[in-house]
Amino acid sequence: MATKCGNCGPGYSTPLEAMKGPREEIVYLPCIYRNTGTEAPDYLATVDVDPKSPQYCQVIHRLPMPNLKDELHHSGWNTCSSCFGDSTKSRTKLVLPSLISSRIYVVDVGSEPRAPKLHKVIEPKDIHAKCELAFLHTSHCLASGEVMISSLGDVKGNGKGGFVLLDGETFEVKGTWERPGGAAPLGYDFWYQPRHNVMISTEWAAPNVLRDGFNPADVEAGLYGSHLYVWDWQRHEIVQTLSLKDGLIPLEIRFLHNPDAAQGFVGCALSSTIQRFYKNEGGTWSVEKVIQVPPKKVKGWLLPEMPGLITDILLSLDDRFLYFSNWLHGDLRQYDISDPQRPRLTGQLFLGGSIVKGGPVQVLEDEELKSQPEPLVVKGKRVAGGPQMIQLSLDGKRLYITTSLYSAWDKQFYPDLIREGSVMLQVDVDTVKGGLKLNPNFLVDFGKEPLGPALAHELRYPGGDCSSDIWI
């Protein structure tokens, strides 16, 4: 799916060229059975999203992993637009790190895109021996041809934000990207911008803290992250630590797609803020809060105040719109970021959540809403959970949404999700004036899977997307 040229590698030459790419016809997403009561392996689902297809909105293939309780989570590619100039590279393998087992699965999606098959399994012992890292999260492909995967911890479940390097051809474990002893205290997501010789990583919590659920006392004890780590891209070492004001649990991080840009955004889940990070004239980096989702005072919930819980953010490929999900409040938002210092709300849509009418939670005080939103029913299915992982079409006109965050937190905050399974929804985007509208004809119900209700997570398109590809 590369731009047509005589001697191109994978992906597209620029983010704006990517916007001209073909419409998505299938998507890949991991489905999780850990913590659901179903003793079955996680699997990679292939879903038909072509409205002209007779199999539209159907799971057309399932690839089960050979082990139980891996907790598949995010995925990345063997190569992407960072290797566009290398015609020897081809985007044919999807790399799936396991959040809990620390196993890495490499899946062949090139031979038969509609029927992926397992290519290689990298066992935890190989990663432990060469890297002393575990609990793996984000996978990004590098221009060097390597694959880089972030970690949350060490083998014992203590916090350790390091990076596993894989050979992009053989998928052998090469070691760590960071220098020996140079890991961050905690880890989660990362994004790099080579033209500014920088990578920035985020942090969730130590695996031992989050593995079995959320305990508010752990927040009081300072066990959850509130920093960004600025790395020298060439020297592979931390050069600055940014402390976030109102920035508890910084998760997904996105630089602007323009490789010349020296700024981006991070979503801070528990504080429910969007923070803008940027490079100063002297070469150091700073951060400022640009969006705050106010908490709601509630009755009948875990705490007296409910945060929005921003769990995923995306930037459109033209760097015009920012999207994020409030998993607990239940709304999906669109902001115009033409002026990155002053994002402007242009679209908001409620897709379930914890404050719907008729539910166990009563909202006592709300700075934003006059009444609690209606429950979401799509094609006769009442949707459990709230909007979580989001993926945008290349042209920016369609958003796909799944409702599961992480099995242990799903079980705690949305027990209905465990019983009924997650769903995949699609939202139409107005890219002229701004605005979001649910497609009432689109529903993939993972509650009806053959082995029982499953928890579907992050989406990927075969040709890359706005959270998998980095331009250099």
Swiss-Prot record:
**Family label:** Belongs to the selenium-binding protein family.
Entry-annotated residues carrying Phosphoserine: 111, 371, 467
Per the record, the pathway is: Organosulfur degradation
- One MF annotation (Gene Ontology) recorded for this entry: methanethiol oxidase activity
What reaction is this protein's catalytic activity? methanethiol + O2 + H2O = hydrogen sulfide + formaldehyde + H2O2 + H(+)
Q: What induces it?
A: Down-regulated by androgen in prostate cancer cells.
Question: What does altering residue 225 to W do?
Answer: In EHMTO; loss of methanethiol oxidation in patient cells
Check the record and name the InterPro entries matching this protein: Se-bd (IPR008826)
Write out the annotated subcellular location.
Answer: Nucleus; Cytoplasm, Cytosol; Membrane
Q: Which GO terms describe its biological process?
A: protein transport
According to its UniProt entry, this protein's organism is: Homo sapiens (Human)
Q: PTM comment for this protein?
A: Phosphorylated. The N-terminus is blocked.
Protein name per its UniProtKB record: Methanethiol oxidase
